[in-house]
Amino acid sequence: MKRVKYKKPRIGLYSTGLEAYWAQFPGLRERLLTYNCFIESNLAKSCDVSNFGLVDTVQKARKAGDWFTEQKVDIIFVHAATYATSATVLPVHQHCSAKVILLNLQPSPQLNYDETNTAEWLANCGACPVPEFANALHRANISYDVINGLLGLSETPVDTKSDENTSHMPEAQKAWKTINEWIQAARIKSNLQQATFGFLGNTYSGMLDLYSDFTMLQAQTGIHIEVLEMCDLQALQDYVTTSDVAEIEQITQDMFNIAEDSPSEKLAKKPSKEQLAKAYNVAATQQKLVEERGLDALAYYYHGAPGNAYEQLQSDFILGHSLLTANGISCAGEGDLKTAVAMKVCDTIGVGGSFCEIVVTDYKEGTILFGHDGPFHIDIAEGKPALRGMGVYHGKQGSGISVEAKVKTGPITLLYLTQTVEGRLKWIISEAESTDGRIMTIGNTQTPVKFSLHPDEYFDALFKEAPTHHCAMAIGHNASVFTKMAKLMGTEYKVI
């Protein structure tokens, strides 16, 4: 199965100007359009750009708004190129509801005061109209954000009187980092709105934090939820071929170590040939289900009468769902749809998203271990994950193969998706460090995590936010992207 390819977001761009300037200052309009093209070329590295060019009249503003709507843009970057009246900006956003980001990117860090004329100044006065734009947008009840800094050209254009080579300067680098974070946030939102999430089986009985209204989830994230039954999966087993199974076996051998018996847990042993064969078959079946139903993610769990055929089938889920997760089909156990969404968010921007919960606190090391009995995101593993044969899944029916692994050492982000008393989704975001600490050999994923807070202080802050008990673990510090994503989606968030 090939890895999921995510679509690029579509970003709108236009530059502001005052029509009266063009006759007064020949060449100014062309110079500002050069800056506009520079911004477009930078944006195009990570998104599809719909560039309207220069907006300098009310009529063009209305036309631009309609055009951006036709283009279905996720964000509109408003390049404040020079002074312009707010009357030539507000109509754009009254005609198109996409998120507004004002770009105040000055070309030069300092004017050549002795040689600067009015045209030179006007090419650098992008900050001048931003308060006016902000006031008009606010009074029209249109939300906006502003990015301030330097434009970031790598060389000074000919006939320019001030030095505009600013790509090396922190004010340019910070501005473009923020711009790219908004693009990543738009990538998340646009892909979620096109995603189909499977819900297979049911939610673990009694885990009240996991229960959420399917309609609410679609309304607030844009995902479509396909309700699936275990018989939908079982029916596909008849179509699994020996070559399908052989392919899964080869992938598994490449990705995993087959662990020996655990030295500490008698229930965690080296997987038997029979256990592996069953897991390979079920993994091939799971891939067929994903392909047949066009799934982008999956929440799953099954609990039925002891010893029935579906129980045997679900006992072998973890390997296949770990392989799917590595290919961009985020899979969350225990029927946790909200955490499946959080995992998908992480995978969309290439930072993993592994299914986790609190495992135990190591007070001597100052860490909290996070993990689960699976599935695991293999792409972000520290070394090769191990497969163990489990005599029992704690708290669940059945037995089979589980994954023992840890997330690679370095910066990580935990992303929780919970639900408030008002029925609104809420993100809880924590940046931390994955350490090279010890873990148990019990056939579960575990990662020792050190926060800037003492473990008890972190728990104090986390538990006050009423989280779900699962979360997605991603590599890298991604809070700035996830907060922007929450703003785009209109959902609450809290950074701890």
Predicted regions and their residues:
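Long, internal scaffold/assembly segments composed of regular secondary structure
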Residues: 246-340, 348
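Periplasmic-binding protein-like
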Residues: 73-82, 101-103, 295-300
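Short, well-structured alpha-helical segments in soluble
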Residues: 61-73, 90-94, 283-292
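C-terminal catalytic subdomain
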Residues: 322-441
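Extended hydrophobic packing segments that form well-structured cores
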Residues: 396-496
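Cap/lid and interdomain-hinge subdomains that line or gate substrate/regulatory clefts
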Residues: 4, 8-11, 111-245, 249, ...
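Short, acidic/small-residue loops that bind anionic groups at enzyme active sites
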Residues: 91-117, 121-132, 320-334
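Short beta-strand elements in bilobed, periplasmic/extracellular small-molecule ligand-binding domains
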Residues: 33-57, 143-149, 223-228
